[in-house]
Amino acid sequence: MKLKHYILTIAVFLCILGCQTETPSCDTVIQGGMIYDGTGEQPFEGTIAIKDDKIIYVGKHKEFEATSTIDATGKAIAPGFINMLSWGYGNLKNDGRSLSDLKQGVTLEVFGEGTSAGPKGKSGDEKYLSFGAAMDTLEKSKVSTNVASFLGAATVRIQHIGYANRKATKEELVAMQITVEKAMKEGAMGIGSSLIYAPGDYADTDELVALNKIASKFGGMYISHMRNEDNKVLDALDELLLIAEKANIPAEIYHLKTSRKPNWHLLDTVIAKVEKARAKGLRITADMYTYNASSTGLTGVIPTWVQEGGHRAWINRMKQAEPRKRLLVDIRKELAQ
């Protein structure tokens, strides 16, 4: 009987040991912070565990054996933010730490609003820089943030037409589509346009549709600073929706807004049209500023007819009396809209 009792005791003890779970291990555990997990749900206090540079747990409080523990009590924890419209390419080439973005929580910088770092120069020339090579330059320099880029629609136009304000020929469109295909194969996210700046606004709707049809074949998307953001914003939105439909491509509106107080009421109609297009099956999204002001450079105020031919032609044109008179009239008219 004693032997049976002893064996039973051992068995129960082993069973209890078997039921106990080991505390999982990780390299870094973050405890006590309010977690905003990116789903849109309410934040919650919990635990995040990281192992081998991968997040292995996000959830309610849980114990981990960790090499490093971060107490985030009183702080917010969120996935890295995406800078959807970054002009940091040049700065990153000079200083890849990206401190200005990292200190604001940005971990991905996306380039390509209208123009992109490549392609530049003539294909075959020693100084030619392809889209892929431009992005590889940053990757090889080991910049701190992740980087991605759209192919600038204006960059494609400059490659084949320059700064002329005219419609692309059929031959030029074919060449432009080849450029898009090459860039998409090199990792472009799609086509980015900025249609209030020269030479981007020299492109008509047909040209933009042609470029986006190629991007669509590679699973790309179209993102656009629309052609107008004031009293003609609805026409500009119609153009974006048409491009999305004809090219069968998802489209996003850069920094959706209506500029100048007389046009603020139009934003309700813009949003309603976007929702209607989405209900129809078009894949339309938008991003917005988190503040109530916008800014731009001189190129956003100077009419694009002045800028035709590039900077040197622009400067020379502004030195002439008649163009200067017309310029002042057009600027005043634009700012009054």
Show the residue positions of the predicted features.
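Bacterial N-terminal signal peptides that target proteins for export
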Residues: 1-7
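Histidine-rich, glycine-flanked metal-binding segment
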Residues: 22-28, 35, 39-80
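Histidine-centered catalytic micro-motifs
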Residues: 81-91, 195, 222-228
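Alpha-helix-loop-beta-strand connector modules within alpha/beta enzyme cores
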Residues: 142, 205-224, 247
